[in-house]
Amino acid sequence: MKITLSIVSHGQRDIALRMLEDILRLSPPDVAEIIYTANIPERDLPALNMGHIRLVVIRNETPKGFGSNHNTAFSHCRTPYFCVMNPDLRFDTDPFPALLQDLTGTPKRGLVAPRIYSPEGELANTARKLYTPRELIRQKLHPVNHGDHPDWLAGMFLLFNSRAYNEIRGFDEGYFLYIEDVDICSRLCLAGWSLAQVADTCVVHDARKQSHRSLRFTRWHIGGMLRYWTRTCFWRYGWRLWREGRR
């Protein structure tokens, strides 16, 4: 068993429970442990038939950000691979064999992700080009999934080589809920690792786009963008991609 899963619930206990039931129904042999973080108070999970999978529940006294929660979960990780997952994913098949095949079969592969689909069967644009103001506008007008050569992968499902995650010290906790995925992909690649979206596997994401409805979420999103665009890793990563002819 090779993988530790990290799932963070922001009061999404019932949604997360459906995903946990999907995972336990499939009983993926590669999954050793699930670390479930309740970021805000919620009802206890019911008794679950975990089989070979160990469940660890963390309850935060005060809410933490995306990166902080997953970094805390990683401190419990004793497996060679660490998977960050949103609680609103659904699984029809086990995605991990194909992901591990790419992750273990490619030298210096630090991160992989599956293709992500909406419940209606639409491919989501979760494999993206460098996060610039121009690219952000382009994606809003004409969403495209750059699965062949992505510069970053969206954070709803990220399977890391634990050595890579540890080497770059995980997520930057200076962000809060947004842009942590963009930042960690940039730093991972600058550290000499690579990333990929694996076309042979997929999961469904039943997204709740709160940032489109809440001023508070919008403020966090804009703050994350400004933080990223003013940091050295953004400029270094952009320069590297330009030299490689990918910009």
Regions found by a protein language model. Give the residues of each.
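N-proximal low-complexity "stem/linker" segments adjacent to membrane-targeting elements
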Residues: 1-22
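Active-site-adjacent helix/loop segment of glycosyltransferases
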Residues: 6, 186-247
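Short, acidic, metal-binding catalytic loop of nucleotide-sugar glycosyltransferases
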Residues: 22-31
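Glycine-rich, basic loop-to-helix element that forms the pyrophosphate-binding segment
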Residues: 60-77
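Short aromatic/hydrophobic "clamp" motif used to bind/position activated sugar donors
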Residues: 82
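Conserved donor NDP-sugar-binding/catalytic core segment of glycosyltransferases
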Residues: 93-124
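Short, flexible, basic/aromatic active-site loop/helix in glycosyltransferases
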Residues: 130-151, 155
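A short, conserved alpha-helix in the catalytic core of glycosyltransferases
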Residues: 152-202
